A protein has these predicted regions:
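Conserved AMP-binding/adenylate-forming core of the ANL superfamily
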Residues: 5-7, 24-77, 94-99, 150, ...
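Conserved pre-ATP/AMP-binding loop-to-beta segment of ANL
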Residues: 23, 143-161, 167-168, 178, ...
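Structural core segment of the AMP-binding/adenylate-forming
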Residues: 53-54, 81-149, 252-253, 258, ...
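AMP-binding/adenylate-forming catalytic core of the ANL superfamily
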Residues: 110, 249, 365, 370-371, ...
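Conserved AMP-binding/adenylation subdomain of ANL enzymes
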Residues: 180-197, 207-247, 262-266
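Gly/Ser/Thr-rich phosphate-binding loop
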Residues: 238, 246-251, 260-330, 343, ...
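Conserved ANL (AMP-binding/adenylate-forming) active-site segment centered on the GW(Y/F)…HTG consensus within
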Residues: 327-332, 368-392, 409-410, 426
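Conserved C-terminal "lid"/linker of ANL adenylate-forming enzymes
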Residues: 413, 439-444, 454-455, 477-533
Length: 534
């Protein structure tokens, strides 16, 4: 048995240890191809030579605009070994937003594939600092591998641009120590061993997919099976879990919800091998967990977790195969105790809050970021000199130190002095037949200055009958009023895909509010609580 690499201080060392111990062992499987640790090491050296030929040197930033593919790993590790800095980007972020990341990161080059080249070049026009657009054929050279500098734990490993749920993405600077220490305590909290088999469809440009699924398995020698994140049919995910006898997988809540809604025939799906299915990156719903476990005959399978990019992902993970814990109101699930080495406190305007009191969650851990790249003002807003990170999330700790997430500070809707959590409204609306997905936002009235509740609901394709849509609007208003005591001031029924989301599936509520007030929804509205849009 190869030794674990959890004591590695850099990602280069972590993977290098695995290469030395078992070069022929599979690191990951993707698109019916297996990449071993030895192959990764050889190809990353080759890609490093291609990057050096293009003028990339130690400290340079290179944006990675890739789908889930082996070339992503070859480029990423090649850059790490050179002492250069990878900057993974959401491939379909949009021309202006991508150009903003190109400029903000001071990237010297972009590594991509032909599928995305046109969009990359459109964004390149808005970033004069960008000198090269490189594809695999530009990097797969026969030059001798360059001399690799010594990489230390304090060096920048990569820059992870945040999802941007409340504004433009910011570059989270993570050191090698941030990543390797987080990977170590994540593997421990999730009780992962080399006997586990991991399946992931999460994107590699997001922290949950990259750090949680791509870097954690090699720390303990577990094989990884990858799927593309744009799965049209969720059955493909569960069929792969069944086929390879996976023991561990992870998804935001909407992924499990998608399986419940869109997999009719469950024959051929057998999840008994799964020891744990983590749920995170968005509010975890007990109703989703119960529906999934009932439909697929699983018990104590889905476990909540909590983290954020600014903390190198992991903060708390619920123990596997342990009954879930609800708060006394029955509304909120615990995401577990903080991981080893992670401290959590709850603060209000009065200071640190006692057990059971809701406030803003702050975190201190070896994973807390170095700061936002080239943005000291934004860094000071969230990161204190004492190392405490303000997360912007709301929650509380119970008397045993278990963490509960209740919402997000900036998302709270204040109606007649009462705080309303958007996720509470969305859970009610999402269970109404005919609704595909929903979002609740508070929009300030120009006349009174007070917030008014707006509900936007995506309706299933083919739902175009005005009478049925009118009935659906009334049903939404009645159920929200019955469940939360407030009537929506306006309900907008829209076409599928209208509600803006981040790369990890979080609702961009501030963006949605701007779309409503700026009258940007236009023809995507199929019915509104003021009348029908033809």
């Amino acid at each position: 048995m190869a030794e674990p690499t959890t004591m590695a201080t850099t990602l280069v060392e972590l993977l290098g240890h695995r290469v030395a111990a078992e070069p022929d062992a599979p690191y990951f499987h993707v698109y019916d191809e297996t990449v071993t640790y030895g192959a990764l090491w050889r190809e990353s050296a080759r890609y490093a030579a291609g990057l050096r030929r293009a003028g990339i040197d130690q400290g340079d930033k290179v944006c990675l605009v890739y789908p889930t593919c082996k070339e992503f790993f070859f480029t990423f590790l090649g850059l790490l070994r050179m002492g250069a800095v990878p900057v993974p980007i959401y491939p379909t972020l949009g021309v202006e937003a991508t150009a903003n990341v190109f400029r903000d990161s001071e990237a010297k080059a972009v590594a991509t594939i032909g599928w995305f080249r046109k969009g990359v070049e459109e964004s390149q026009a808005g970033a004069s600092n960008l000198r090269h657009v490189l594809e695999p054929q530009d990097l797969e050279v026969d030059d001798a591998a360059p001399a690799f500098p010594a990489v230390t734990e304090d060096d920048v490993a990569f820059i992870q641009y945040t999802s941007g749920s409340t504004g433009l993405p910011r570059g989270v600077v993570l050191s090698h120590a941030n990543v390797t220490r987080t990977v170590a305590f994540m593997a421990e909290a999730a009780q992962l061993t080399r006997d586990d088999v991991v399946v992931s469809w999460l994107p590699l440009y997001h922290d949950m997919g990259l750090i949680g699924c791509a870097f954690t398995p090699p720390s303990i020698g577990a094989p990884l099976w990858l799927l593309p994140p744009d799965l049209k049919n969720p059955r493909v995910w569960l069929e792969l879990v069944t086929k390879v006898r996976a023991t561990f997988t992870v998804s935001p809540d909407f992924g499990y919800r998608n399986c419940v809604r869109n997999i009719g025939d469950t024959s051929g799906i057998e999840l008994s091998s799964l020891k744990q299915a983590l749920s995170g990156a968005e509010p975890v719903r007990l109703s989703t967990i119960q529906a999934f476990e009932e439909k697929f005959s699983a018990e104590n399978l889905i476990t909540p977790c909590y983290g954020l990019a600014e903390a190198t992902l992991a903060v708390a993970i619920w123990p596997r195969k342990t009954p879930l814990r609800l708060d006394s109101s029955g509304r909120f699930l615990s995401v577990g105790p903080p991981c080893r080495g992670v401290s959590v406190k709850i603060t209000t305007e009065a200071g640190e809050a006692p057990a059971g009191t809701e406030g803003e969650i702050s975190v201190r851990s070896p994973g807390v970021m170095q700061g936002y790249y080239r943005n000291p003002a934004a860094t000071r807003e969230v990161l204190g000199a004492d190392g405490w990170l303000r997360t912007g999330d709301l929650g509380f700790l119970d008397r045993e130190g278990f963490l509960f997430i209740t919402g997000r500070v900036k998302d709270l809707i204040i109606l007649a002095g009462e705080n309303l959590v958007p996720a509470d409204v969305e859970e009610i609306v999402d269970h109404i037949p005919g609704v595909r997905y929903s979002a609740a936002v508070g929009i300030e009235s120009e006349r009174t200055g007070s917030q008014r509740l707006h509900v936007v609901a995506e309706v299933r394709e083919g739902a175009e009958d005005a009478e049925r849509l009118s009935h659906l609007v009334r049903e939404i208003v009645q159920r929200v009023h019955r469940g939360r005591g407030h009537r929506p001031a306006r309900v907008l029924l829209v076409t599928p895909g209208t509600i803006p989301k981040t790369s990890s599936g979080k609702i961009q509520r501030s963006r949605l509010g701007a779309m409503i007030t700026g009258d940007e929804l236009g023809e995507r509205i199929v019915y509104a609580s003021g009348g029908h849009r033809d």
